[in-house]
Each structure stands twice: as structure tokens, then as C-alpha cells.
């Protein structure tokens, strides 16, 4: 809501509606806008007053006249123009639950259709007595709009106010029943009026008989009880000549083929003349069909002898589920009625439909005559068109003759399913996290396991992602067996042989699981072992994944897709592009996250992108580019009974051309009309039905911004990133529901777990909105452009919840990175815009920083039309963004003395943080907080209940907003707060979600109440049933303090969520928060690298020579004294941000500048880099300075590779016992010195028996899940008990004195990289972390474990040739490796000098040309050609800084990645690979539990 920023529109509406001189109750507005003079405008206030005494203040945007009526609410997400003109609202003051109204303005209210009916309205004008909304869009945008909503309301003299907590109002009506109310302006007192005592039907009915569709063959008499225009349209469309008669017209003697009664408002029992006329028809011999709609249902029932009653709160909205009693099929319906028939029907009549939620009557039918009626609105407008088929049924009755009933003409359900009988189900996970396939599948897989357990189905989970919650082996919500194995057809087949499941779920493991399942189907494995694919069939999956099949399927139902050709060669791709015309879009089959896709403006780009795409797949789609169109997504659920619901629709703020995973996304869609919304919804359901999807799927549309033209982009027949977002945005647990559906359970029988009362067969209503913003880490990848497009690049995302776009948008921006204050022109991480910035180019070429470029353009007074032209972003979003910057300017003109409570409150309502405000007012954040609280401005806690408060909810799913007037919940539990990890990014991924979930579960097992704060929709920790209270909120000092104090928490755990919460330790502590575990003062000493190094010196714990430096001269002086290379490290960072090995003075200058930018408040530490050392990790739990649990793992790679990118071995393989004892001794000293109570991690360098400390983190590390699962001891469980002061049984813990060292198996943790997505990035490892995920596997020895782990990362073991590229210094060490590879039968290729050296040492090698020298020597083959034709299927490239072929080596590495072949760039990993290939002839399918069982058997 932008109250302070909307004065221009207020002026317009005030001038057009009434004179300013009449305003009595006034509110001062401050307003400034570029190009517009400063205005001082007074906005009129009014109150909504209820008969129970409730009084709420609001601000007028309609006609300034008091009015009385019955206050009702509508939870619909769209179609306010249609709703306002619905005659059923006559005499009622309508409360819209949708928090933002007026986005699309008002259409042409004078336009008429071919029947002479108002084209965009459901009657001849607005019928509501008044309108109440939370937030009104003064600035509107839609291609059909001709004026603002406020202007239209004033023209029709209808009062409307905004600024009302509509959720609070809805709850009052819900709990107390519909009640009388009034909108009162000062000086215009009115009495309460009960419209139900009036015959409202008479007021809205036509006064004359009117005929529509004259000359049509079927005569239908339509009795107007407040009939909607769309009823008439639908009748005429089907060939009716409609005779519209007044409500009291005697139609009993009229000649007709069918009789329809439709409407309307008020108490139907008051329409006695109509009831008597219908009674005559029912009791006569006339058997022409009768169809009653809404009031027509009650009128028909009353005429038949049934009774009606006034409902306590009415059914008004667009998501009411009804069940056809005759065939058990469910439909989503639009409803608007306050009266209903009771369930005792007279003889000869029976119910036809029933409400799934409240079991009220929704329709009746005669048992022998063609009479039927429904309580809902099959003509909708606004709302879903699911039951429009009833008009067809009505006409079928007319055509069939007079002696039949409605059941004979209703369409038969497409499917009648039965429960799928399975006893054991195999669930395929997605493997390690990668760009495009991240933590959302941990969430969805965990939900699927939970659903199976609820239904007493045994589950076998196959997933090598050691860091995921779903791969826990112990717990009530865990699978019965877990296999840490590669998700490949070979290994899945072995698991099927061993476990003999009778069911298989493919939809919870992303593209990995889907592709694997398709291959198993094609190979006949599933048929051979009698495994049923649950949910969507493989044939349907193939129809969505194969681009040609998909196109053919859509053509079968005449659905719109972009003109396209599926091709299998570059030659055909070029021909297709010529036929379609450039620009074209290419898409790969069976690909994830837009991999292998891109926009090709010309032939050269198509050649480049197409060649890379064909390296990954055998088929691509070449299609017309719809860049610049709107991108809209729907999440659709369909059960085996053909019941369909659309759970969520989402709108990409970024237009087509940017992958949805890289787009800013809002839910629900904000700029669609009801016609657009329902058109795409209807299409979604039609497509999903035709494709045979059973479960959940995502469908993406391109919608033309100024017409109704659309095309379908793709369908994902599985849970996806968007599914996880939709689940968290709505509270509807999509994965859980999809898993139940896969067992054949129909939707109406599944409970809505959020409300605890309603069915899962419904479409959620939102009285808030969410904004998703991606998190990129492109700066980490050298050579990668910040430009984004159709291939996804983001590594994570956040979701923010608010009740205005501005609020959720600014929250989301801050959630993405702690350095961001909100929507500002400043770049994240304190970066500066380049001096030669081309702002127009920044806007026209989407990038990871374009949102800040938009802010900069607005700051520079660029016009909105120009920004729209450059970005194709809908102007409505830009209006809102401009409003934020206008508030920023307003605040900058004030100070702590002059800023008013009103202005401060308005800033908070549009998402300004205290920190943001403090920078405008010249205060500190603490001073701003103090000022705000002094003015009694505080946030409100609201629930996400899936129903917009329509039903009471048991949900604990919460968010915080300044747009409200009451809390939804009580604060009487005083739980322990646990801070989650925030957005996934490089260095902080699913492993920290595992830590948080483990801690939460331990607390709950101990009987402690938990309060969780996190903002990542991909996580299990943000699953509302994991904790007692879930706040989907910012991990900022301000918001944590808000929640902590409001909840009166008993303490806060910050050490299980990674670096973001850890960085809050000291600020929270200084603000009085009780930090559980290690003291924040000790955390501060450890995080500050300078202080930590000094402490180690005091403890006489060995470390490499170091120095804290503040200037370049200090750094150069130190480096010259100890010699290069040196390691440069900033403080308080995660995953090696700005950490670099420095080899020269030039590098020192460059890297030091970067390090000081990311860590401005703390000194940078320089350390002598120790070459040739092995890195060792110590993961441990301390208790009051004593180590009570520990695990030591070893890196395969030598030091210099970030620990997050390293391959870990547990137990250690090459470290001497003497060195291990030194590691333990140093750990003891550190634990004692820092009085550690909780989790911590220490990293060591080991060279021979020398042991040096690298760093210590007084929090959980990313290797905690790995060591916990490997050793069978949950380190976080232990740490949590320590932190809250619970006793810990140390007898079975791996203490320093009695370690647990596996003897029968070895665990290998391997990193997952996403190099193919990061176009032009150099795929080589450095100090700064680059991996996006991890996997772990187990084997009897290191070699089998290593090969399993490598295969789990997608590594393909070569079958033909290996290209070797090594620098001269590597040769002596590499010769043995080369001999091993040659002996294993691989053909070796090498550049000329290396080839000569290998041949001279009796290792045959074929010489090849460097890429830059291709063609110079005809006898030397091209590396790129050999790779692309498959002669080379592994590249070993071991460069150093001394080579003169730096660029050539980069080209070779990049070619390997772009061609989808294996690449090794580390000598130690290459050496282990060669050994593994030689020694591990076969790789078994055993997993951790097999080895544990063997160990237990030996022990017994």
C-alpha cells in the first residue's frame, strides 16, 4: 500500500467525484515525483463500523457518502470488476480478501457485446453497496483499462475505503456470522440497515420481458432474480432464444423448451410469487427441463417443499469445492450466497452436489423429471469454468425430450480409480544439488516419504545426497531403507533386484529421477520386475519431455504453442530457423533448468548454442521466440479420478526470455484480468488431463501483454522448483498431496493439513502476496557474464511474504543478501557501478543486477515508458518500484525530529527496514528502532492458512507485516528460536538445512517448543509441520528481534544455519537475546582472523606465518618476508568469499581490494601458503570447553582447494597417527580456550608429521551431515542437547579418547559442480568455493567408494580416449598415472611436447594440436573435433600459473564441459581415479546400512 505516494490519483478521483471543500476528516499527504510539482493533498478518512461495535479506520477512494448494509467477504483472487457488478451483492458491503485491488483499473464500462449486454460487467453497473480493501492501486495498468477503479466507483456513487485490515474483518465475520455494518464519513451518520428484510430480488430483476438471440432454435425462459450477463451469453452461445422475464412474471402458461431461474441477492423466501409459479410447474404435467442457479436452487427447493436457512458466514469466493454425489467427481466453483437448502428434501428429490468442506447442499435433482438446480455459479465470471458443462447438460436434456433426468446427460468421469495396492515403494531422489536442481527435491522427497509412512507403505529411498534431510536413516519421517548410490539405470536396477519394490515414484527427484525412470521403462526393467510407476505414467512423462511428442499432443486438442520444429541435427535446426524466422528459441529435450536452451537472434548464435545443446541431448526444439511476453505459471494437481485443481498461479516480473528460475516471481499473479486468469487456468487443466498427468505438474505460458494471445511453453510432469515455491507460497503441501494421489487416493478424501478441517480438493486463497527473488553467485566464477537468459544460473532463491507488493519485494531483496537494504540503486556487496555504465544496455539485457539498474534509472528520472520499452516489465510493477524510491526521497528530506508517525508507518508498510530508514534520516539502525517503537509502530504477525481466514485454522505458518491491525495468534509458548540458513548459495546449501532440521527435531523430542525463522522455500526447515511456529521471514537483526521479543523466546540457536545467522551472534547478544551454546564473544574472537591467530600463538598451537594487514604496503612487506604464494583471507565470510592464493604483487593489489570490500569492518589476514600439504577437517561438539564428539576426515586434494570443493575421505587414509594426535591436541586447546559449547569445525594442514591450524568455525560446518551419517552419531543432536543444558550420554559418543573409526567401510564425499550452466566460466578449482552440492557413497575400500561417489556426481567413466594436459613440473609425479591408464586400455592423447615425453617413457600417446594452433600442422588432430566426435571422453587438464598456454588450457577445459564429457583438473583426484579404475573392477550396489549390518554381525 502506497498511501503517501498516491496523491496524483487521489487528486484526480477527488476532483471527479466531489469538491475538496466538503472534506471534513483529513489526513496530510506528502508527495513528490520527478517532473511533478510537490503537492499537498488531503485524503478523506472514513470508518467501517460493525453492529458488534467494531470500528476500523480507512481512506476513501470511492464516492464520499456513508452507506449501510450487510458486510460480507469474498476470497477470490481476481475479477473484481465482475464481482462488483454481480447482482447477488445488492445491499452488501463487500470485503475483498485479496490484499491489492485496482491493479488493472476499470474496463470500458460503456462497451457492449453483440447481444447488447455490457461487455466487461455482469449487470448494468456496480451492485455492491460499498467496498472494503486493504490496499488500493492508484496507479493501474492493463491493456483494457480506461480509468481507475476509484474513478468508476465515484461515477456510480459507490463508497470504498482502503487501509482496512481485511483479514481481521474476515475473521470477525467468520467467527460471529455475517453482520450488519456501515461505511461512515464524518458528519454523515447513517443507521444500520438489514438488506435481508428487503426483497432484493425485486430490486435487481428486469422490469420488462427482454429477448436475446432472437431466432435461435431453442426457446429458454430465464427468470431474472439478479441474473448475471454471462448466463445469457452462455445460453445464446448454445443456440437459445432467451426470453428474460421479471422475477414475478407468470411464466407458467408460456411456451418454452427450457426454464432457467438464476440470481441473486437477499433472502429467497421473500420471493413468494416466484416460488408459487415454480411450484405450479413442478406439480404440473409439464416436463420441460428446469435449471436453477444459485438463488434458483433455493427457489426450486422451496417450491418443492424443502426448507432454507441463513448461513452463518455464507459461501462467497472462487474456490469452493463441490462433489457430484452421483459420480463422486469434484469441481472448483464460484459461489455467492448467504442462504442454503437444508438436507431434508421432499420425496422425489435428492441431492446432486454437496460442498466438500462444510457439507452444505450445493444442488438438487428430481428423481424422475428433468429438473435440477445448483447453488454455485456454473456461469462464473469471475471464477473457474469447471462446471460450465452444466449448460451443455441442460441443452442435452432439452434435446433428449421430456422424460429423462439430469443424471442421464451428465458427462461420465474420465477415470474411476481405485486405491493402488503396493507394499513397498522405491523413491528416486535427485542426487547432489546443482543449478536448476536444488534443495526443492529434498523437500519434495521428504514429503513423499512422510505420505507413504502415513499410508503404511514401506519406502526405499535412493539418493546419494548425504546432506539432505530425506537421507537420514533414523526417524519417524524417514524411509525404511536408504541407498547412497548413483541415480543411474544400472544402480537402480540393482536396487530393484535387491529390494523388490512393487511401486516406483519418479516425480520427486527432478530431471535426474525422471530421465532414469524413462530409461528403465525403455529397457524393460520395470516390466521384468513387476514395478508399477505410481502417479504420472512413463508414457505421459515422455509426452512432456520429448519436444516433438509434446507438440503433437497439444495439437491434438488445438492448444496454442509457439511455431516449432523438433530436430535431431544442426542442419535441420538451421532449416527450421529459416522457416520460422529469426529470432528463435532453442530448447533441449529431457533437460533441466533450461540447460541447452537460448535465444538465437541469428544463424551464428544458433550454430554456437545448437552445437553445445546437441552435445548434451539428441533432440532440440527450435521455436518462435516470444521474448517480451508475460510469463505465467500454474501449478496443477490431478488425481486418478480426474479431479483437477490449480493450486497456485505465478507471474514472472521479468518477461519471457529469462528462465523462470532466474526471474523475480510473484504469487498470485498481479496484472491479469479475470478473463486472462481463467483462460490460462482452463487451458492448464485441459492440457494436464489430455497428457494424463496424475499427481502434480507445472505448466508455463507466454501471454501477449496487450491481447488474449498465449502459447504454452512447457509442462513439467513432476515436482519442480516452482512447485516448492507454490507450496510455501500457499501453504498447500504439493509433494505430500501428490504422493497420496500416486497411491490412488482421490483429492476429496485427502485432508487439508493446514486448516485441519477442509479438504485438499480446493484452490488456496491468499490474503497476502509473495515475491521470489533468485540468488546468484556469478562473481565467484571467473569469466562468467552476469547476463541471464533462458538457461538458469541462480544457485538459490528466497521468498518474502507481505500484504503489498512493495513490502514483499523489499523484504525479498534483503533476504537475498545481508548487504542489500531494499530496492535501491546500490549494488550488493558494496560494489560500485562502472564509471562508463550504459544504463540503457543494463536495462535491455537481463542480468543478475538488473533490478538495481531499474532503481538507478528511476533515480535518474528515466520515464516509466522508456523502462517498459527496454525491459518489457509490466508498468504496474514499475509504478510500485517508483513509489519506493519516492518514499526514499521523502525520508531523505526529513530527520528524527521532523519525521511524523504517519510517514514512518507508511515507510514500514511499503517494506522499508529500520536500517534503510536510518540511512535516510542520518541515524543508526538502533536509533531508528528506538524511534519507531517510541511512536508505537510495530509489526503484526499473520497466519498463512490457505483459505484467507475463511475457516478457522490450526496452522503455525506465520509471517510478519506492517499492513494489519491485530495479531492472528497468541504468544504464550516461549519456545526456543532456531535460525535457518537463508537462501542457498555457494558455501551454504542443503547441509545447513539438515543441521537446522536436526536441531529442531531434537528440541521437539525433548519437549521444547520451537520457533523457526527462515526465508528459503526449498528447505525442509520451512515445512510448517517440522516446528511449533514457523516464521517465513528475514534473517535480519531487526526481524529476529521483533519475533524474539514478541514470542518472549527462551533462547536462540544461531550455530546450525551457517554464516548468515552466525554473523548475527554479536548484534543479537548486544540487544539482549540469549544465545544458546558458545558465547557470542567467543564467536567474535574466532571469526576475526587476526584475533584468532593471536590466540593460537598464545596457546602455542602451530599455524602458518601470518599477519593482519590494513594497507597494501603491509601486505607486500609481509609477502616479501615469507615469500609467495600467500593466502589472503577476509573475516566473517563463508565458502572462501574473496579468499585467494596470491602469487605476485599485481595479484596482491587486485585481491586485497576485493577482500576489504567484502569485509570492511575487520582486518584481512595474510598467511604463508604451504604447498604440498594435505588438508584435514575436524568436526566436533564441545561441552563447556571439553570435546565430547569428534570426527576427522581427510581431503583427497592437496591444500589450495576450498574445503567445500574438496573430496573428503572418512576415515583418513594417508595421515599418520602422530599427526592425528597433534590434530586432537590442538582441537582440545582450542575448545578450552574458546569455552566451546556446541558445534565447531577446525581445518588443519598436515605435511608429514607437521600440523598447522588453518581456521576454526564456532558453528556447524557443511560436513556435519556427512560425518554424522557415516559414524551413526547425529552431531547436531548432541550439540543441541549441550546448548540447551540437557544431559548427554557420552558413553557411545566418539570422544577424542575413544573415537569411532569405521573399519569395514570407507565414506567418500564428492563435490557437485554446475559448470555446463555457467557459460564461459573456467572450470578449475581455487580457494574460493565453486561447487553447488555434494554426494557421498560408501565402499569396502576407498576405490569402490570413490567410483560410486564420482558416478553420483554425473561423472562418466571413459570408454575410449583420454586427453592429457599437464605442465612440465607435474611430469615426474604423473608418469605412473599415465601408465595405469594406458594399461587399462585407454587411448591417450596429449599436446605435442607432453606426447613426446610420454612416448619417450614407453607410454603410447597420440599428439594433438593446441586449440590456438589448429590447422597449422595437418598431422595434428583438433582436440575439439576429437571431443565432439567421441574419440576423447575424458579430459585430464592439470595447469599451473607458469604455462604459456593459459588460454588454450581454458578452451580445452571449457570444450570438455560444453560437450558433456568428464573433466579432471586436480592431480590427487586424477591419481585416485586411475587407481580406482585399476583396482575396482566392479562396483557393487551396497550402501551404508549393508556395511553397518556387517559390522554389527562381526561385533555380535
Swiss-Prot record:
Class of the enzyme per the UniProt entry, highest EC level: ligase
Keyword Zinc-finger: no
Targeting presequence: 1-38
Bilayer topology term: Peripheral membrane protein
Tissues expressing the protein: Primarily in the liver and small intestine.
Domain MGS-like: 1355-1500
Residue ranges of every copy of the ATP-grasp domain listed in the record: 551-743, 1093-1284
Modified residues (N6-acetyllysine): 55, 57, 119, 157, 171, 182, 197, 207, 210, 214, 219, 228, 279-280, 287, 307, 310, 412, 453, 458, 522, 527, 532, 553, 560, 575, 603, 612, 630, 751, 757, 772, 793, 811, 831, 841, 856, 875, 889, 892, 908, 915, 919, 935, 1074, 1100, 1168, 1183, 1222, 1232, 1269, 1291, 1356, 1444, 1471, 1479, 1486
EC number: 6.3.4.16
Gene Ontology molecular function terms on file: ATP binding; calcium ion binding; carbamoyl-phosphate synthase (ammonia) activity; carbamoyl-phosphate synthase (glutamine-hydrolyzing) activity; endopeptidase activity; glutamate binding; metal ion binding; modified amino acid binding
Activity control, per UniProt: Requires N-acetyl-L-glutamate (NAG) as an allosteric activator. N-acetyl-L-beta-phenylglutamate (Phe-NAG) can also activate CPSase I, but with an activation constant that is 2-fold higher than that for NAG.
Glycosylated sites: 537, 1331-1332
Domain Glutamine amidotransferase type-1 span(s) in chain numbering: 219-404
Residues the record lists as N6-glutaryllysine modifications: 55, 171, 176, 207, 210, 214, 219, 228, 237, 280, 307, 310, 402, 412, 453, 458, 527, 532, 553, 728, 757, 772, 793, 811, 841, 856, 869, 875, 889, 892, 908, 915, 919, 1074, 1168, 1183, 1224, 1356, 1360, 1479, 1486
GO cellular component, one term: mitochondrial inner membrane
Keywords linked to the UniProt accession: Acetylation, Allosteric enzyme, ATP-binding, Cell membrane, Glycoprotein, Ligase, Membrane, Mitochondrion, Nucleotide-binding, Nucleus, Phosphoprotein, Repeat, Transit peptide, Urea cycle
Post-translational modification: 50% of the mature protein that was isolated had Leu-39 as its N-terminal residue and 50% had Ser-40 suggesting two adjacent processing sites. However, the possibility of proteolytic removal of Leu-39 during the isolation of the enzyme cannot be excluded. Undergoes proteolytic cleavage in the C-terminal region corresponding to the loss of approximately 12 AA residues from the C-terminus.
PROSITE patterns: ATP_GRASP, CPSASE_1, CPSASE_2, GATASE_TYPE_1, MGS
Protein purpose: Involved in the urea cycle of ureotelic animals where the enzyme plays an important role in removing excess ammonia from the cell.
Quaternary assembly: Can form homooligomers (monomers as predominant form and dimers).
Protein's name according to its UniProt entry: Carbamoyl-phosphate synthase [ammonia], mitochondrial
Organism: Rattus norvegicus
Gene: Cps1
Amino acid at each position: 500500500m502506497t498511501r503517501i505516494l498516491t496523491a496524483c490519483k487521489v487528486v484526480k478521483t477527488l476532483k471527479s467525484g466531489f469538491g475538496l471543500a466538503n472534506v471534513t476528516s483529513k489526513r496530510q499527504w506528502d508527495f513528490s515525483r520527478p517532473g511533478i510539482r510537490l503537492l499537498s493533498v488531503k485524503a478523506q478518512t472514513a470508518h467501517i463500523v460493525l453492529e458488534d461495535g467494531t470500528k476500523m479506520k480507512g481512506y476513501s477512494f470511492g464516492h464520499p457518502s456513508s452507506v449501510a448494509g450487510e458486510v460480507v467477504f469474498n476470497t477470490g483472487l481476481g475479477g473484481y470488476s465482475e464481482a462488483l457488478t454481480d447482482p447477488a451483492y445488492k445491499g452488501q458491503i463487500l470485503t475483498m480478501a485479496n490484499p491489492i485491488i485496482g491493479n488493472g483499473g476499470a474496463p470500458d464500462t460503456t462497451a457492449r457485446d453483440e447481444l447488447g449486454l455490457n461487455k466487461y460487467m455482469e449487470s448494468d453497473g456496480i451492485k455492491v453497496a460499498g467496498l472494503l480493501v486493504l490496499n488500493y492501486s492508484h496507479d493501474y495498468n492493463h491493456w483494457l483499462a480506461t480509468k481507475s477503479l476509484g474513478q468508476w466507483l465515484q461515477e456510480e456513487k459507490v463508497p470504498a475505503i482502503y487501509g482496512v485490515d481485511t483479514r481481521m474483518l474476515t475473521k470477525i465475520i467468520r467467527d460471529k456470522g455475517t453482520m450488519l455494518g456501515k461505511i461512515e464519513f464524518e458528519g454523515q451518520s447513517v443507521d444500520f440497515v438489514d438488506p435481508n428484510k428487503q426483497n432484493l430480488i425485486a430490486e435487481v430483476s428486469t422490469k420488462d420481458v427482454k429477448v436475446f438471440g432472437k431466432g435461435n432454435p431453442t426457446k429458454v425462459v430465464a427468470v431474472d432474480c439478479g441474473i448475471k450477463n454471462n448466463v445469457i451469453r452462455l445460453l445464446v452461445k448454445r443456440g437459445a432464444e432467451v426470453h428474460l422475464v421479471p422475477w414475478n412474471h407468470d411464466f407458467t402458461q408460456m411456451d418454452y423448451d427450457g426454464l432457467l431461474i438464476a440470481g441473486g441477492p437477499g433472502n429467497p423466501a421473500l420471493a413468494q410469487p416466484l416460488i408459487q409459479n415454480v411450484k405450479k410447474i413442478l406439480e404440473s404435467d409439464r416436463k420441460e427441463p428446469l435449471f436453477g442457479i444459485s438463488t434458483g436452487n433455493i427457489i426450486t427447493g422451496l417450491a418443492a417443499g424443502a426448507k432454507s436457512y441463513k448461513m452463518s458466514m455464507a459461501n462467497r469466493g472462487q474456490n469452493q469445492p463441490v462433489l457430484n454425489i452421483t459420480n463422486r467427481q469434484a469441481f472448483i466453483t464460484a459461489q455467492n450466497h448467504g442462504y442454503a437448502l437444508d438436507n431434508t428434501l421432499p420425496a422425489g428429490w435428492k441431492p446432486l452436489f454437496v460442498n466438500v468442506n462444510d457439507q452444505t447442499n450445493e444442488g438438487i435433482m428430481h428423481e424422475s423429471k428433468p429438473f435440477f438446480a445448483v447453488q454455485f455459479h456454473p456461469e462464473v465470471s469471475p471464477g473457474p469454468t469447471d462446471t460450465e458443462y452444466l449448460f451443455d447438460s441442460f441443452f442435452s436434456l432439452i434435446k433428449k425430450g421430456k422424460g429423462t433426468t439430469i443424471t442421464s446427460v451428465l458427462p461420465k468421469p474420465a477415470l474411476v480409480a481405485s486405491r493402488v495396492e503396493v507394499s513397498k515403494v522405491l523413491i528416486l531422489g535427485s542426487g547432489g544439488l546443482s543449478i536448476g536442481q536444488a534443495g526443492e527435491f529434498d523437500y519434495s522427497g521428504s514429503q513423499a516419504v512422510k505420505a507413504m509412512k502415513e499410508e503404511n507403505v514401506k519406502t526405499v529411498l535412493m539418493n546419494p545426497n548425504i546432506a539432505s534431510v530425506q537421507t537420514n536413516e533414523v526417524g519417524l519421517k524417514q524411509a525404511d531403507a536408504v541407498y547412497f548410490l548413483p541415480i543411474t539405470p544400472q544402480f537402480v536396477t540393482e536396487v530393484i533386484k535387491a529390494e523388490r519394490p512393487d511401486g516406483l515414484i519418479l516425480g520427486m527427484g527432478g530431471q535426474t529421477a525422471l530421465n532414469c525412470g524413462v530409461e528403465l521403462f525403455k529397457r524393460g526393467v520395470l516390466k521384468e520386475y513387476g514395478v508399477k510407476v505410481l502417479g504420472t505414467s512413463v508414457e505421459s512423462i515422455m509426452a512432456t519431455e520429448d519436444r516433438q511428442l509434446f507438440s503433437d499432443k497439444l495439437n491434438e486438442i488445438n492448444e496454442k504453442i509457439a511455431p516449432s520444429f523438433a530436430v535431431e541435427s544442426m542442419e535441420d535446426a538451421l532449416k527450421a530457423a529459416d522457416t520460422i524466422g529469426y529470432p528463435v528459441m532453442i530448447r533441449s529435450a529431457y533437460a533441466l533448468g533450461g540447460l541447452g536452451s537460448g535465444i538465437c537472434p541469428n544463424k551464428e548464435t544458433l550454430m554456437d548454442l545448437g552445437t553445445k545443446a546437441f552435445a548434451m541431448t539428441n533432440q532440440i526444439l527450435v521455436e518462435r521466440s516470444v521474448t517480451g511476453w508475460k510469463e505465467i505459471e500454474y501449478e496443477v494437481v490431478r488425481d486418478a479420478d480426474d479431479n483437477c485443481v490449480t493450486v497456485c498461479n505465478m507471474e514472472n516480473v521479468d518477461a519471457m526470455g529469462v528462465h523462470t528460475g532466474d526471474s523475480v516471481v510473484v504469487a498470485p499473479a498481479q496484472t491479469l484480468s479475470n478473463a486472462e486468469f481463467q483462460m490460462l487456468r482452463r487451458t492448464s487443466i485441459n492440457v494436464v488431463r489430455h497428457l494424463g498427468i496424475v499427481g502434480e505438474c507445472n505448466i508455463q505460458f507466454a501471454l501477449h501483454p496487450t491481447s488474449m494471445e498465449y502459447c504454452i511453453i512447457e509442462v513439467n510432469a513432476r515436482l519442480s522448483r516452482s512447485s516448492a515455491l507454490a507450496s510455501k507460497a500457499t501453504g498447500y503441501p504439493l509433494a505430500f498431496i501428490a504422493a497420496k494421489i500416486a497411491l490412488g487416493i482421490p483429492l476429496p478424501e485427502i485432508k487439508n493439513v493446514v486448516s485441519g478441517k477442509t479438504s485438499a480438493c480446493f484452490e488456496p486463497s491468499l490474503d497476502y502476496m509473495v515475491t521470489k527473488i533468485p540468488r546468484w553467485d556469478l562473481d565467484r566464477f571467473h569469466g562468467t557474464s552476469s547476463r541471464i537468459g533462458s538457461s538458469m544460473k541462480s544457485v538459490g532463491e528466497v521468498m518474502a511474504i507481505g500484504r503489498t507488493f512493495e513490502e514483499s519485494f523489499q523484504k525479498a531483496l534483503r533476504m537475498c543478501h545481508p548487504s542489500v537494504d531494499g530496492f535501491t540503486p546500490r549494488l550488493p556487496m558494496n560494489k560500485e557501478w562502472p564509471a562508463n555504465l550504459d544504463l540503457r544496455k543494463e536495462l535491455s539485457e537481463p542480468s543478475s543486477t538488473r533490478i538495481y539498474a531499474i532503481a538507478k534509472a528511476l533515480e535518474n528520472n528515466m520515464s516509466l515508458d522508456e523502462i517498459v520499452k527496454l525491459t518489457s516489465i509490466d508498468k504496474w510493477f514499475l509504478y510500485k518500484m517508483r513509489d519506493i524510491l519516492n518514499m526514499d526521497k521523502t525520508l531523505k528530506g526529513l530527520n528524527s525530529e521532523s519525521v511524523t508517525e504517519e510517514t514512518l508507518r507508511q515507510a514500514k508498510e511499503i517494506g522499508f527496514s529500520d536500517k534503510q530508514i536510518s540511512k535516510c534520516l542520518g541515524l543508526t539502525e538502533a536509533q531508528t528502532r528506538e524511534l519507531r517503537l517510541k511512536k508505537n509502530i510495530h509489526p503484526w504477525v499473520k497466519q498463512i492458512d490457505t483459505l484467507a481466514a475463511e475457516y478457522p485454522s490450526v496452522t503455525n505458518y506465520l509471517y510478519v507485516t506492517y499492513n494489519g491491525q491485530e495479531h492472528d495468534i497468541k504468544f504464550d509458548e516461549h519456545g526456543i528460536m532456531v535460525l535457518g540458513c537463508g537462501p542457498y548459495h555457494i558455501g551454504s546449501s542443503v547441509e545447513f538445512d539438515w543441521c537446522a532440521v536436526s536441531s529442531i527435531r531434537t528440541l521437539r523430542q525433548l519437549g521444547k517448543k520451537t520457533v523457526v525463522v527462515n526465508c528459503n522455500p526449498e528447505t525442509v526447515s520451512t515445512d510448517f509441520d517440522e516446528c511449533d511456529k514457523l516464521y517465513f521471514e528475514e534473517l535480519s537483526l531487526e526481524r529476529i528481534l521483533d519475533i524474539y521479543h514478541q514470542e518472549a523466546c527462551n533462547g536462540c540457536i544461531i550455530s546450525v544455519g551457517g554464516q548468515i545467522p552466525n554473523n548475527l551472534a554479536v548484534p543479537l547478544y548486544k540487544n539482549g537475546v540469549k544465545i544458546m551454546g558458545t558465547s557470542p564473544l567467543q564467536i567474535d574472537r574466532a571469526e576475526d582472523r587476526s584475533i584468532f591467530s593471536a590466540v593460537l600463538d598464545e596457546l602455542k598451537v602451530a599455524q602458518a606465518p601470518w599477519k593482519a594487514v590494513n594497507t597494501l604496503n603491509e601486505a607486500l612487506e609481509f609477502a616479501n618476508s615469507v615469500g609467495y604464494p600467500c593466502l589472503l583471507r577476509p573475516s566473517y565470510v563463508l565458502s572462501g568469499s574473496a579468499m585467494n592464493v596470491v602469487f605476485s604483487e599485481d595479484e596482491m593489489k587486485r585481491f586485497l581490494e576485493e577482500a576489504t570490500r567484502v569485509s570492511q569492518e575487520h582486518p584481512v589476514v595474510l598467511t604463508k601458503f604451504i604447498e604440498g600439504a594435505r588438508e584435514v577437517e575436524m568436526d566436533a561438539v564441545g561441552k563447556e570447553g571439553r570435546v565430547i564428539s569428534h570426527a576427522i576426515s581427510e581431503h583427497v586434494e592437496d591444500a589450495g582447494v576450498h574445503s567445500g570443493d574438496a573430496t573428503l575421505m572418512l576415515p583418513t587414509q594417508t595421515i599418520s597417527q602422530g599427526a592425528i594426535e597433534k590434530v586432537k591436541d590442538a582441537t582440545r586447546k582450542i575448545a578450552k580456550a574458546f569455552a566451546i559449547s556446541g558445534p565447531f569445525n577446525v581445518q588443519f594442514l598436515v605435511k608429514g608429521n607437521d600440523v598447522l591450524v588453518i581456521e576454526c568455525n564456532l558453528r556447524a560446518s557443511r560436513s556435519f551431515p556427512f560425518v554424522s551419517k557415516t559414524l551413526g552419531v547425529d552431531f547436531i543432536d548432541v550439540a543441541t542437547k549441550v546448548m540447551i543444558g540437557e544431559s548427554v550420554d557420552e558413553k557411545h559418543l566418539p570422544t577424542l579418547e575413544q573415537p569411532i573409526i569405521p573399519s569395514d567401510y570407507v565414506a567418500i564425499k564428492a563435490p557437485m559442480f554446475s559448470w555446463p550452466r555457467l557459460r564461459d566460466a573456467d572450470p578449475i578449482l581455487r580457494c574460493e568455493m565453486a561447487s553447488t552440492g555434494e554426494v557421498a557413497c560408501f565402499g569396502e575400500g576407498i576405490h569402490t567408494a570413490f567410483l560410486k561417489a564420482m558416478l553420483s556426481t554425473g561423472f562418466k567413466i571413459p570408454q575410449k580416449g583420454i586427453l592429457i594436459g599437464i605442465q612440465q613440473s607435474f611430469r615426474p609425479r604423473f608418469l605412473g598415472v599415465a601408465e595405469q591408464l594406458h594399461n587399462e586400455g585407454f587411448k591417450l592423447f596429449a599436446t605435442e611436447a607432453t606426447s613426446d615425453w610420454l612416448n619417450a617413457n614407453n607410454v603410447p600417446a597420440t599428439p594433438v594440436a593446441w586449440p590456438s594452433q589448429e590447422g597449422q600442422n595437418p598431422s595434428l588432430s583438433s582436440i575439439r573435433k576429437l571431443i565432439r566426435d567421441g574419440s576423447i571422453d575424458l579430459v585430464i587438464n592439470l595447469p599451473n600459473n607458469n604455462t604459456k598456454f593459459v588460454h588454450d588450457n581454458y578452451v580445452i577445459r571449457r570444450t570438455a564441459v560444453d560437450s558433456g564429457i568428464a573433466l579432471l583438473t586436480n592431480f590427487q583426484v586424477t591419481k585416485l581415479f586411475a587407481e580406482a579404475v585399476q583396482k575396482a573392477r566392479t562396483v557393487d550396489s551396497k550402501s551404508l546400512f549393508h556395511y553397518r549390518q556387517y559390522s554389527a554381525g562381526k561385533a555380535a
